[in-house]
Amino acid sequence: LAEIESSALTMRFSGISTIMYGGAAMNACWVLENHPACYFKFPKPQLSGGSLWDFAASACLFKEMGVVVSDMQSKSLDLNRADSTFMNHRGVLYASNDEIADQIKLIYSKATRNK
């Protein structure tokens, strides 16, 4: 969270506020309601977290509104996997603008490089 806080201050935001409740659909909708905002899940090897049905409708809304929705590599969400319904393999990212999305992807990139 410290790196996200630092990025927020660099982008001239007053800081961050975290929401630690709600499911994937609600968290994505809150991004639209609370600009500037983001909701993300970094990729992980474990089969857990949200499934495609948790993200499909909100991804459609974000695309129609021209708001950022992608995985951590800036690719479209993989909503038609044959091997699993889980979205853990590439992560998810919803952001109210490109600058926030780029910062979250940069933080993820740095974290995975240091492993």
Language-model region placement:
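An extended, acidic
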Residues: L1-K115
